[in-house]
Amino acid sequence: FAIMNVCQSGDNFISSTDLYGGTVNLFTHTLKKLGIECRYADPADPSNFEKLVDEKTRCFYAETLPNPYLRVFPIKEVADIGRKHNIPLIMDNTASPVICKPIEHGAAVVVHSLTKFIGGHGTVIGGCLVDGGNFDWTADPKRQPLFNEPDMSYGGAKWGEVVPQLTGANVSFAVRARVCLLRDLGAPLAPDNAWGLIQGLETAPLRMKQHCSNAEKAVDFLKKHKNVERVIYPTLHEGDIAARSKKYLKGGNGALV
């Protein structure tokens, strides 16, 4: 939904090369069949994103703490490049908002797989979109046509204009996703799953603290094990990646090793 909310056939978006495998399949194969092109940029150098921008580029996409290499993404650096071109940065923050808050660093939209750490008990399946309310969808109408051209499926509404007028908030992304994509493609959260997620949210900060502690103990053990050649964890990176870990991971270094 996040990509289809800004892209249509003939458009492109730029994604980090550090991605979960299922997301790579979605971007490389499924969206391609819909006429949406994904261009991949190596996040080791944030300027790689800018090099791929053209007049049809609608958004940037990345994961906060991508599996399996756990190289923290340069959120602010790429978000700033995007805003220079009126391009929003969409962040997959499945690593959890307890660990990192991408919107505070300039991301326009955050997506989560709620099944993982927010649910936390293996009992629900779900995802969510979080509109940061910090992106002006009308600043460059040619860059964001889906928010500035009349939507004839909804009485000619121009989402970038009408949503702030009606709500007093800059949440055009969230509203359009709900009234257009959810209307046409489905994927509403089941009530029982919603209830399970509420239970998970109550303990998320406590669970993430323990997850991170457990992971760090596992790292210490594996580093010393004679049969282990390499251990990957955010605290073990060096240089720019290590600096990003300290900058963006304020609630712990994550549960993945």
Predicted features along the sequence, with ranges:
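Conserved glycine-rich beta-strand-loop-beta hairpin in the small C-terminal domain of fold type I
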Residues: 216, 232-257
